[in-house]
Amino acid sequence: MAEKKEWWKNAVIYQVYPKSFQDSNGDGIGDIKGIISRLDYLRTLGIDAIWLSPVYRSPQDDNGYDISDYQDIDPMFGSLADMEELIAEAGKRNIKIIMDMVLNHSSDEHRWFVEAKKGKDNPYHDYYVWRDGKEGVPPNDMTSAFGGSAWEWVPQLGQYYLHQFSVKQPDLNWDNPKLRKELYDMILWWMDKGVGGFRFDVIDLIAKEPDRKITSNGTRLHEYIREMTANTLSKGN
């Protein structure tokens, strides 16, 4: 069983960037049906898995790494049914699908963040990282990877939210067990659909400690990863 679960150690993994891989409908954008049409070609290369860059529903502020719905496919790439077909057809050719997964942040258009901005008492408010403050005076001098402050002012709340990337990518609050359970349930949902694995983008940032200006490899990082593995990946193959 251990050997089966560690197939990835010796696997040949081929990354597919969907926008530019294969366009099936002539709109100039690669899509899932295009990938399906090339599976036989990919099989001839001798690959064991496809690492699929983000295809989730997204405003595309950061090439799909700003996810507004983890359980839907962006229309530019097709539909959820197309994704299910890709998983099934790849499986027939002994090719696993590894999905890019972003758990450090979501899009600001995700329903969680839309709700979070409605008030400090909203149950989704604590899904994100907030600090009280004054306009023009961020909590500290942390900077975004994309430049400028990592804090964005929300006047109706009198608070700043943390974004280590684009202002449209608010950081998720992994200290909140309810948030973690939502993410684990979502991962299991994809695993139930037959996804073979995940490539976790910037996973080292999930345990950030903004008050200490620690952005990566925070104190609880290994705790979170062990918990996530126990609740998700350990249940698959």
Each language-model region and where it sits:
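Active-site regions of oxyanion-processing enzymes, predominantly non-cytosolic
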Residues: 190-200
